[in-house]
């Protein structure tokens, strides 16, 4: 497996231009006095958290919010070690992560913030328009390694074209979800190109005529001029395109999924973290839509806000993803009527 490491991306507010005229030391002192909120994890959730951080910092110039990208798994590792305040996650916390947090005394508040359509993409020149979950397994599955190397091996009507496979790395929540929903937890082939950075996957597929990959819908929306999204055949046998509408109506299964932030109970005691998380939940609906996600119903954000303010810790998912679930299924899992 070729694994490409992402550069760490961060959202931050620059010091006011007027301050640049002052000497270096006052600038450093002013910066040091700013309160800090730290988040890390999913590249899929990054656009939402980045958008929220930017808007929050416009209104709270005394608070600096950093948003890193290390994949959902990487974010949970840092979170359970007490290194960050918030973990961005494109899947629920796993049982082993629950245990890792427990061992370090890290209690957490689980907050769903939006729904995503995991999107399968190919090169713009590829004539394939739709694909089944079985065909996806035949392309990405462990058994395909060094065997399925041409599109025509997947289906006789597919083009005679070398197959090049791109996928998120194993620290990615998007990888975990795809592995569970499509590959029955058997893992991906070892001869693909993997990266936690979705932009690297975009570049790979857009430059490779036989390329195929998958990532969150927002990255497809941002790069749809370079890529082609495939319709995925759902449980009713209908080929359905990834879209906000098809997530809302529940037809884009099994690749529609909720995304989350997890807030450390200890961090939530800090006024700057409380202020940021409250702002996040108040604005996630509007901002998630702007960056290509499907907002949750208003009652879901109200319930999440109540959960946060009442300090209700733990997970309702028992270490499992909501595979093939709709927004209504998420609300039921969260106990929201």
Curated annotation (Swiss-Prot):
Signal peptide: 1-30
Domain of life: Bacteria
Pfam families from the UniProt entry: PBP_like_2
Keywords linked to the UniProt accession: Cell inner membrane, Cell membrane, Membrane, Signal, Transport
Gene Ontology terms for molecular function: phosphate ion binding
KW Ribosomal protein (keyword) present: no
Recorded family membership: Belongs to the PstS family.
GO cellular component, one term: plasma membrane
CDD domains per the UniProt record, alphabetical: PBP2_phosphate_like_2
Post-translational events: The N-terminus is blocked.
Lineage: Bacteria, Bacillati, Cyanobacteriota, Cyanophyceae, Synechococcales
Disulfide-bonded cysteines: none
Subcellular location: Cell inner membrane
Role of this protein: May be involved in the system for phosphate transport across the cytoplasmic membrane.
UniProt protein name: Protein SphX
InterPro entries documented for this protein: PBP_domain, Phos-bd, Phosphate_ABC_transporter
């Amino acid at each position: 497996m070729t694994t490409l490491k992402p550069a760490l991306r961060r959202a931050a507010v620059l010091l006011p231009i007027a301050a640049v005229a002052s000497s270096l030391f006052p600038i450093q002192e002013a910066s040091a006095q700013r309160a800090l909120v730290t988040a890390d994890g999913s590249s899929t959730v990054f656009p939402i958290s980045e958008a929220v951080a930017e808007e929050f910092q416009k209104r709270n110039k005394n608070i600096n919010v950093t948003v890193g990208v290390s994949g959902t798994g990487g974010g949970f590792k840092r979170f359970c070690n007490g290194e960050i305040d918030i973990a961005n996650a494109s899947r629920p916390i796993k049982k082993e992560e629950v245990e890792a947090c427990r061992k370090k005394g890290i209690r957490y508040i689980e907050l769903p913030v939006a729904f995503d359509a995991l999107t399968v993409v190919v090169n713009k020149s590829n004539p394939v328009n739709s694909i089944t979950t079985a065909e996806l397994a035949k392309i990405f599955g462990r058994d395909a390694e060094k065997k399925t190397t041409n599109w025509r091996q997947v289906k006789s009507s597919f083009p005679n074209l070398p197959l090049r496979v791109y996928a998120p790395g194993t620290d990615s929540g998007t990888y975990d979800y795809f592995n569970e929903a499509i590959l029955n937890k058997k893992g991906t082939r070892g001869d693909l190109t993997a990266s936690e950075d979705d932009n690297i996957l975009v570049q790979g597929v857009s430059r490779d005529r036989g390329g195929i990959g998958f990532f969150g819908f927002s990255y497809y929306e941002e790069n749809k001029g370079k890529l082609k999204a495939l319709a995925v055949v759902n449980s009713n046998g209908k080929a359905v395109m990834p879209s906000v509408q098809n997530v809302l109506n529940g037809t884009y299964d099994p690749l529609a999924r909720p995304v989350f932030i997890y807030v450390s109970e200890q961090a939530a005691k800090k006024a700057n973290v409380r202020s940021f998380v409250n702002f996040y939940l108040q604005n996630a609906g509007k901002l998630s839509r702007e960056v290509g996600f499907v907002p949750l119903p208003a009652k879901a954000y109200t319930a999440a806000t109540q959960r946060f303010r009442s300090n209700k810790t733990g997970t309702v998912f028992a270490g499992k993803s909501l595979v093939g679930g709709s927004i209504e299924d998420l609300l039921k899992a969260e106990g929201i009527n």
